[in-house]
């Protein structure tokens, strides 16, 4: 039996999301690699934090941001360093494996929708040998 599991991108809470509307220019850390950086930007768009160019999809980069109503600064960095960088950031979009490894699961605000394009494209598949279900 195969089960589809979405690779979790967790938006880790350092301050309340509502605080972003104050226009204080909060910093949000995202993974610097193209695959996870694009996924992070799509998640931020889904949360209403920013708007990306129409149709940019998973290839989204910081240059594709067309609206930034909360005046956030996107700070791209090595994905593995995001958990340790939380004290210097207001928020971070962190891959599930790094969030879990850092023991910050209690700070998860949201996760990527399992039906999203990103989850459908890059999700993990768990396969079990028949008879070992």
Regions found by a protein language model. Give the residues of each.
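Short helices/loops that flank or line small-molecule/ion binding pockets
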Residues: 38-43, 63-93, 97-98
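Ligand-binding "clamshell"
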Residues: 24, 88, 93, 101-114
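Positively charged n-region of N-terminal signal peptides that target proteins for export
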Residues: 1-9
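Solvent-exposed coil/turn segments that connect beta secondary-structure elements
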Residues: 33, 79, 96-98, 113-114, ...
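C-terminal motif of bacterial Sec signal peptides marking the signal peptidase cleavage site
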Residues: 15-19
């Amino acid at each position: 039996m195969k089960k589809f599991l979405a690779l979790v991108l967790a938006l880790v809470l350092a301050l309340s999301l509502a605080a972003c509307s104050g226009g204080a220019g909060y910093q949000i850390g995202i993974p610097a690699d193209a695959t996870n950086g694009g996924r992070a930007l799509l998640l931020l768009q889904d949360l209403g934090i920013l708007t990306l160019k129409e149709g940019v999809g998973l290839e989204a980069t910081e240059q594709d941001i067309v609206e930034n109503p909360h005046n956030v600064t996107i700070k791209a960095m090595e994905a593995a360093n995001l958990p340790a960088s939380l004290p210097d950031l207001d928020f971070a979009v962190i891959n599930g494996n790094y969030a879990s490894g850092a023991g910050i699961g209690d700070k998860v605000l949201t996760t990527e929708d399992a039906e999203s394009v990103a989850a459908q494209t890059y999700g993990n598949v768990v396969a079990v040998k028949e008879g070992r279900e």
